[in-house]
UniProtKB/Swiss-Prot annotation:
This is Membrane-anchored ubiquitin-fold protein 4. It comes from Oryza sativa subsp. japonica. Keywords: Cell membrane, Lipoprotein, Membrane, Methylation, Prenylation. CDD domains: Ubl_MUBs_plant. It comes from the Eukaryota.
């Protein structure tokens, strides 16, 4: 019975430790350079907050520069991260080593590029084309 109690206390302590867990996150840019690492709380920090931080810390000498956080997509573990999730929810199921920083890949897609380009209208009249092949 005492073993069950100890296991329960250890599980509760693990949940508290996870709530206060500080993680290091670094961001890999398109050219292979990095932003960070920065320390943040895994439960309290959302993906949207990370995107804001990436835009604020973006190097000025890059050819591609995001204007807003909506222009940035973060990828971790092969998945595009959703803005409303926190870091703890986005971790890979196998987990990261505690002593290493979590690397997130940054993709910049300007919002103007997301809109579909208008179809170019061809001013030539449409003609019906037929062909016959005799074998």
């Amino acid at each position: 019975m005492a073993e069950k109690e100890e296991g329960k206390v250890a599980a509760e302590g693990g949940a508290e430790a996870e709530a206060d867990e500080e993680v290091e996150v670094k961001f890999r840019l398109f050219d292979g350079s990095d932003i960070g690492p920065l320390r943040c709380n895994a439960v309290a920090t959302t993906v949207a907050a990370l995107k804001d931080r990436v835009v604020a810390d973006w190097p000025k000498d890059k050819t591609i520069v995001p204007k807003t956080a909506n222009d940035v997509k973060l990828i971790s573990g092969g998945k595009i991260l959703e803005n409303d999730k926190n870091i703890a929810q986005c971790r890979a199921p196998f987990g990261d080593l505690p002593s290493t920083a979590i690397t997130m890949h940054v993709v910049v897609q300007p919002s103007s590029a997301k809109s579909k380009p208008d179809k170019k209208t061809n001013k030539l009249p449409k003609t019906t084309r037929c062909s016959c092949t005799i074998l």
